[in-house]
Amino acid sequence: MSNLKQKDSKPEVAVTKSVKTYKKSIEYVNSDASDIEEDINRAEDEYASSSGFVNFLRDFKKRYGEYYSNNEIRRAAETRWNEMSFRHRCQYSAEPLDTFHVEPNSVSSLQRSSEGEHRMHSEISGCADTFFGAGGSNSCTPRKENKCSKPRVRKSCPKPRAKTSKQRRSCGKPKPKGARPRKACPRPRKKMECGKAKAKPRCLKPKSSKPKCSM
């Protein structure tokens, strides 16, 4: 009977241990989830106006909160934030210059991304952005400053040209080749002066019809 009692008592101890460990794991998960929620809420309250990641995390939580747990949604938001470009991140910040100046104790997920983001912010004047599909590269060369150039001379207004009236061609028959051009104004003809009246010829005397005597 003693052996049977000992055998019966062993599984009871195992069951109680498993129940205790299960309760502890549930309490640990709940405490971890509650701590994450408290950290997020505290960060949202303190850095809602300055931190762009907190605003992005709030938006990401509203959209995809049903598909992720509290621990997974922070990691998913962090990976998505690291893939975003600088201009896209500035859309979630009220002050774009202070996007990367977030205290390390506010949100633990910003520790890895803050270093690269701060370097991008210091070299933003010469870096190529991938927001519009441009090729991104780690090596950024600063832009060359433009030298002092000569002032451009403004173009003066063009002088008005004299309008020439073009002669319109008439729809007449084409002139034959080699035709003499007509003078525009013909010369006036000289008027003939009135001449003196010619003298009439005198009437000759009639010859005598009588024959002369021959000797």
From Swiss-Prot:
One of its GO terms (biological process) is sperm DNA condensation. Residues 140-215 are annotated as: Disordered. It comes from the Eukaryota. This is Histone-like protein 18C. One of its GO terms (cellular component) is chromatin. Not known. Encoded in the intron of cAMP-dependent protein kinase regulatory chain type I. Residues 149-190, 197-215 have a biased composition (Basic residues).
